[in-house]
Regions:
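Alpha-helix C-terminal capping segments
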Residues: 55, 62-74, 96
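Low-complexity, intrinsically disordered short segments enriched for Gly/Pro and polybasic residues
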Residues: 1-8, 112-118
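Residues at secondary-structure transition points
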Residues: 51-58, 85
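Conserved N-terminal subdomain of the carbohydrate kinase-like
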Residues: 74-159
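Positively charged, low-complexity intrinsically disordered leader regions
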Residues: 3-51
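A general structural signal for well-ordered alpha-helical segments in protein cores
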Residues: 29, 60-64, 87, 119
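A generic fold-level signal
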Residues: 24, 47, 58, 115-117
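Gly/Ser/Thr-rich helix-start
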Residues: 34, 58-60, 81
Length: 159
């Protein structure tokens, strides 16, 4: 439960964190969620496509990117990615979107994806009477491995 301290203009969550006043924060928005590599088959179906355009995507990230691009808000993402070529591609897309990636937790790649992976999202476009269709491949992803202590929340929100 947050409570206001009139003298310092900060907020305390429990007894563990003092939250900075908004005018002293590094970010206008910080999103926490999975950022995946999105594969788009164009006008084709996923099961018949032989090539895909690639993008980044994820609900929470999309909000941060949209606020950055449309309203010039200072945006950051907190997520987990595997330190391999796919993870670095997702990072590059996020940087192109203007979102701060300094709070990404990087996981080592085991060479096979047995211990941790980057999420994939295949998305067919909707047109005419056909609705959009998504097919996620999100098992054992880096962001699902985030646990308490992995992120320095005091650095992000605290004094």
């Amino acid at each position: 439960m947050a409570r206001s301290h009139r003298k310092t203009n900060t907020f305390t969550i429990g007894t563990e964190m003092n939250i900075k006043p908004a005018n002293t924060c590094d970010y206008d928005i910080v999103s926490l969620g999975e950022v995946m590599l999105r594969l788009d088959p164009g006008d084709r179906r996923i099961h018949t496509a032989r090539s895909f355009d690639v993008w980044e995507g994820g609900g929470e990230y999309n909000v941060a990117r949209g606020l950055r691009r449309c309203f010039n808000q200072r945006a950051a993402i907190v997520t987990g990615l595997v330190d391999n070529s796919v993870g670095r591609l997702v990072e590059d897309f996020m940087l192109q979107g203007g979102v701060d990636v300094n709070h990404v937790k990087w996981y080592p790649h085991d060479g096979l994806g047995r211990t941790v992976r980057n999420g994939l999202n295949f998305t067919e476009r909707g047109f005419g009477a056909r609705g959009a269709l998504g097919c996620g491949d999100r098992g054992n992803t880096a962001s699902s491995k985030l646990k308490p202590g992995d992120i320095d929340w005091e650095h992000i929100f605290g004094e």
